[in-house]
Amino acid sequence: MKVRASIKKMCRNCKLVRRKGVLRVICSAEPRHKQRQG
């Protein structure tokens, strides 16, 4: 899980999701692409 000020989709499987007011990237193909805005 990377914590970044600016999060971007890294591949076509990445999805932007808002959970509890926090923007996240989840990726089914590559778990290393997981990110959180913070």
From Swiss-Prot:
Gene: rpmJ
Domain of life: Bacteria
Recorded family membership: Belongs to the bacterial ribosomal protein bL36 family.
HAMAP family hit by this protein: Ribosomal_bL36 (MF_00251)
PANTHER family reported in the protein's UniProt record: 50S RIBOSOMAL PROTEIN L36, CHLOROPLASTIC, LARGE RIBOSOMAL SUBUNIT PROTEIN BL36C
Gene Ontology annotations of biological process type: translation
One Gene Ontology term of the molecular function aspect: structural constituent of ribosome
Record-given protein name: Large ribosomal subunit protein bL36
InterPro entries: Ribosomal_bL36 (IPR000473), Ribosomal_bL36_sp (IPR035977)
GO cellular component: cytoplasm; ribonucleoprotein complex; ribosome
Keywords of the record: Ribonucleoprotein, Ribosomal protein
